[in-house]
Regions:
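Generic structural signal for small/hydrophobic residues in well-ordered secondary structure
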Residues: 36, 90-91, 140
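Extracellular/periplasmic catalytic domains that process cell-envelope and extracellular macromolecules
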Residues: 2-4, 79-80, 103-104, 129-131, ...
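Conserved donor-nucleotide/metal-binding helix-loop-beta segment in metal-dependent transferases, i.e.
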Residues: 93-125
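Catalytic core and acceptor-binding pocket of nucleotide-sugar-dependent glycosyltransferases
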Residues: 131-226
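Short beta-strand-to-loop acidic/aromatic patch adjacent to the donor-nucleotide binding site
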Residues: 82-94
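Short His-Asn-centered micro-motif
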Residues: 12, 39-41, 88-89, 112-113, ...
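Short glycine-/acidic-enriched loop or helix-start segments at secondary-structure transitions
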Residues: 21, 48-49, 96-99, 148
């Protein structure tokens, strides 16, 4: 069994409980994590959970996708005591434990690569960013604690500085990996390159993940597992 004692496996949700619990159990089938947490409203968690899953109360209820994104940026670190967190969802979890490499732990953020797009994922300095999807991602406690040290703006749709952004979107992965990536990097955070991220997670077919069966997936299974 793969020992990931420095990683906490997490599902943050108060809906679709059966699917999220199943995703947690699927992810722990061949892996021993440092901790396994279902962060939710306790009155929404079914009884009789497997003993490996520890339930923690949300700091405040999540009622929308914006609430979720805000929680992931500013609050999730309060639940984590290991060096890293693997956040999963009911539509994305571990599918290939053998693809794990300790190289992943050298980074503060890894998520499935985004496709290169002419008009998307452009940071305030005009650079295209490709890593990466936050729904199923590996993050360091160091990265999660950055908002406790410096101001990480939530509203990234106002003014000239964020002129490259998609107005009206508050997605947490866009905030951390595109809009305010420079602020995290100033605190020493290191983002995985596309080639490493492609080995970590699959979301859609890309030249970089051709022929690979990554460690986790988000939404769509890699071709080798369909």
């Amino acid at each position: 069994m793969l020992d990931l004692k420095d990683v906490t496996l997490v599902a943050l949700t108060n809906m679709r409980m059966e699917g999220h619990i199943s995703a947690l159990m699927e992810s722990t089938e061949h892996i021993k994590f440092g901790d396994v947490k279902l962060i939710s409203e306790k009155d929404k968690v079914p009884s009789g959970l497997p003993s490996v899953i520890n339930v923690e109360e949300m700091i405040y209820p999540i009622r929308s996708i914006d609430d979720y994104s805000f929680y992931m940026i500013y609050n999730i670190g309060q639940h984590i005591e290991t060096t890293h967190m693997l956040i999963i969802q009911d539509h994305g979890f571990v599918v290939n434990p053998s693809a794990w490499t300790d190289e992943f732990l050298e980074y503060d953020y890894i998520g499935a690569p985004w496709a290169w797009s002419e008009n998307a994922y452009i940071d305030p300095f005009g650079n295209h960013q490709r890593v990466g999807n936050g729904g199923v991602s590996l993050r360091s406690k160091k990265l999660m604690d950055v908002p406790n040290k410096v101001v990480i703006p939530w509203d990234v749709n106002q003014g000239d500085f964020y002129k490259h952004m998609n107005a009206g979107l508050f997605n947490e992965d866009g905030n951390i990996c595109v809009h305010n990536k420079h602020l995290y990097e100033e605190q020493g955070c290191k983002y995985a390159p596309v080639e490493v991220a492609a080995k970590f997670s699959y979301e859609r077919d890309l030249p970089e993940n051709k022929g690979l069966t990554p460690f986790v997936f988000h939404y769509s299974l890699p071709p080798s597992l369909r």
